[in-house]
């Protein structure tokens, strides 16, 4: 039977519940347990697919095509379980399910209420995502005290009663601020946060206390006394140099042993050698490279969270310190690509909408003409095609119909038909809703022999995750290829261009998919690893000049 660990957060948001949950999951996995993680988000959106990255951060895409919270990216980077659409539910999705049932008459004319109908649906979704695992860790988004979180908190309160204390426990993550002027840590916010939680019927079994510095035994004893939590179960989680140290920090305080004991789990001792290896490798840096990230959401790093982590992973596996320099594409549009002179490599990530596109095109032109290593992802590949069509093929004004429906040379257009991850045919047009209607999830891609892409991956066929509506217009492929563009990757049915590269460039690759979603610190991703190695070579060549 599945055991449940419910994780809540208090005092302030952005404490790192997702990292803490994923780290504990990694330790439990290292003890031989099958672990999954579920994120419950209180917002009314059905999913984050149409939300602004400035508000939500990146949208993480699962292999089965779900658009989910970025915390699922943390989950996949820390544990080996592949996340699915069952690992993320929002208030909007829960209410949508309940309203559909009400319209069908499933409630037999009854009055539909938050309790029991919404809470029952929340419990059903949790159990659906947890099925067949030894342990399910369920993270409740938001902060205790927020009105939006109340149905979720009520649902997990009920689950604890229904399952019993040996099948469900509560972990509360809270802030213990350090006041520099007095040199003291303050426990009062934590006390009040737990008081708020207890007022709705939830008594935490474990407290994880986020702080700048390790908590003293006296502070831990004080927190334990005022929150009714065992002293050994008050865990100090101070700021770490790397998030990949956190499994070791939690294990050193016996958090996994506390959890195993409370849930009566049979598990071997944790083998964290894999995580120790990652941390040791991260400490070895023989060179620093500067990689330009040219995007439109550069004010918020979380908008490119998985790419940032993928570059970090590549650095770990190449003994490289990767310094990401963020460039607002509109600044390059205004001031030119000479801003990129000191850069060792250029990356243009995905995005939507016309703003900043011309700046991205200028950055790509600079990379092509100056032989700077380049990696384009999703929109990054599309803008690379536009740049090549305009400046090499000579199709002046070439564009995507996403940005200019009247362009004379629509080198990119809306995909009207494709096969979904499960093999079903999807059909779209300009009037289709924006939400949940893109080409999403893992898709097969065939790599052409003798190409850089084939060399990087080392195999003829790959599966990568997609999130897009527009694709290269096959009408212009022959002309592009004739002028030196190499189509190095195509969809399984050969109808869609998935990867491009240049014949006369040392390292120029672009892909329609999102390789960042499958990178992890243990193995890195070949595309990012080779990109960082190319940046190292370019850096060394610059030094010789």
Swiss-Prot record:
How is it regulated at the activity level?
A: Allosterically activated by GTP, when glutamine is the substrate; GTP has no effect on the reaction when ammonia is the substrate. The allosteric effector GTP functions by stabilizing the protein conformation that binds the tetrahedral intermediate(s) formed during glutamine hydrolysis. Inhibited by the product CTP, via allosteric rather than competitive inhibition.
Q: State the residue spans of region: Amidoligase domain.
A: 1-265
Per the record, the pathway is: Pyrimidine metabolism; CTP biosynthesis via de novo pathway; CTP from UDP: step 2/2
Q: Which residues bind L-glutamine?
A: 351, 379-382, 402, 469
Instruction: Please name the Gene3D superfamilies in this protein's record.
Output: 3.40.50.880, P-loop containing nucleotide triphosphate hydrolases
User: Which terms in the GO cellular component ontology are assigned?
Assistant: cytosol
Q: Which residues bind CTP?
A: 13, 146-148, 186-191, 222
| GO MF entries | ATP binding; CTP synthase activity; glutaminase activity; identical protein binding; metal ion binding
Q: Where is the Glutamine amidotransferase type-1 domain?
A: 290-541
| Residues that, per the record, bind UTP | 13, 186-191, 222
- Record's superkingdom? Bacteria
Question: Which Enzyme Commission numbers does its entry carry?
Answer: 6.3.4.2
Q: What catalytic activity does the UniProt entry give for this protein?
A: UTP + L-glutamine + ATP + H2O = CTP + L-glutamate + ADP + phosphate + 2 H(+); L-glutamine + H2O = L-glutamate + NH4(+); UTP + NH4(+) + ATP = CTP + ADP + phosphate + 2 H(+)
Key word Metal-binding present? yes
Its GO biological process annotations read:
'de novo' CTP biosynthetic process; pyrimidine nucleobase biosynthetic process
Q: What else is known?
A: CTPSs have evolved a hybrid strategy for distinguishing between UTP and CTP. The overlapping regions of the product feedback inhibitory and substrate sites recognize a common feature in both compounds, the triphosphate moiety. To differentiate isosteric substrate and product pyrimidine rings, an additional pocket far from the expected kinase/ligase catalytic site, specifically recognizes the cytosine and ribose portions of the product inhibitor.
**Stated family:** Belongs to the CTP synthase family.
**HAMAP family for the chain:** PyrG (MF_01227)
| Known function | Catalyzes the ATP-dependent amination of UTP to CTP with either L-glutamine or ammonia as the source of nitrogen. Regulates intracellular CTP levels through interactions with the four ribonucleotide triphosphates.
Record's protein name: CTP synthase
- Source organism of this protein record: Legionella pneumophila (strain Corby)
Q: Which gene encodes it?
A: pyrG
């Amino acid at each position: 039977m599945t055991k449940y660990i419910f994780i809540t957060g208090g005092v302030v948001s952005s404490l790192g519940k997702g990292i803490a949950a994923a780290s504990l999951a990694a330790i439990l996995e290292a003890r031989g347990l099958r672990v999954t993680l579920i994120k419950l988000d209180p917002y009314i959106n059905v999913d984050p697919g149409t939300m602004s990255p400035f508000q939500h951060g990146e949208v993480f895409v699962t292999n089965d095509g779900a658009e989910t919270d970025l915390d699922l990216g943390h989950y996949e980077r820390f544990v080996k379980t592949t996340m699915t659409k069952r690992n993320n539910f929002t208030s909007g999705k829960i209410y949508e399910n309940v309203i559909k049932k009400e319209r069908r008459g499933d409630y037999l004319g009854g009055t539909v209420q938050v309790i029991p109908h919404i809470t029952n649906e929340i419990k059903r979704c949790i159990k659906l995502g947890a099925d067949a695992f030894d342990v399910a860790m369920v993270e409740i988004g938001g902060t205790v005290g927020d009105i939006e979180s109340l149905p979720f908190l009520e649902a997990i309160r009920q689950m604890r009663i229904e399952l019993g204390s040996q099948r469900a426990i509560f972990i509360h993550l809270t802030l213990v601020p350090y006041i520099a002027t007095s040199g003291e840590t303050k426990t009062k916010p934590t006390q009040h946060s737990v008081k708020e939680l207890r007022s709705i019927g939830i008594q935490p079994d474990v407290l994880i206390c986020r702080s700048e510095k390790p908590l003293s035994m006296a502070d831990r004893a004080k927190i334990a006394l005022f929150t009714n939590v065992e002293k050994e179960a008050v865990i100090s989680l101070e700021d770490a140099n790397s998030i990949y140290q956190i499994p070791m920090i939690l294990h050193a305080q016996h958090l996994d042993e506390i959890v195993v004991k409370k849930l009566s789990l049979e598990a071997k001792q944790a083998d964290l050698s894999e995580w120790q290896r990652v941390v040791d490798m991260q400490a070895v840096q023989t060179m620093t490279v500067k990689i330009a990230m040219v995007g439109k959401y550069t004010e918020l790093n979380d908008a490119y969270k998985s790419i940032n982590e993928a570059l970090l992973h590549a650095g770990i596996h190449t003994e490289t310190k990767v310094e990401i320099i963020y460039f607002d594409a509109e600044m390059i549009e205004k001031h030119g690509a000479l801003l990129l002179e000191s850069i060792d490599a250029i990356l243009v990530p995905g995005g939507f909408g016309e703003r900043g596109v011309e700046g991205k095109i200028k950055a790509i032109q600079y990379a092509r003409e100056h032989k700077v290593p380049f990696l384009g992802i999703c929109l990054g590949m599309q803008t690379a095609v536009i740049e090549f069509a305009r400046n090499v093929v000579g199709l002046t004004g070439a564009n995507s119909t996403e940005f200019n429906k009247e362009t004379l040379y629509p080198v990119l257009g809306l995909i009207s038909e494709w096969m979904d991850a499960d093999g079903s045919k999807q059909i779209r047009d300009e009037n289709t809703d924006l939400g949940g209607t893109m080409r999403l999830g893992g898709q097969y891609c065939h790599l052409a022999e003798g190409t850089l892409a084939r060399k990087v991956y080392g195999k003829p066929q790959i599966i990568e995750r997609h999130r897009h509506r527009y694709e290269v217009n096959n009408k212009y492929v022959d002309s592009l290829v004739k002028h030196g563009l190499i189509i190095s990757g195509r969809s399984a049915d050969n109808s869609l261009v998935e990867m491009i590269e240049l014949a006369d460039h040392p390292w120029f690759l672009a892909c329609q998919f999102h390789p960042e979603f499958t990178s992890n610190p243990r193995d890195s991703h070949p595309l990012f690893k080779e990109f960082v190695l190319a940046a190292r070579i370019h850096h060394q060549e610059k030094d010789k000049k």
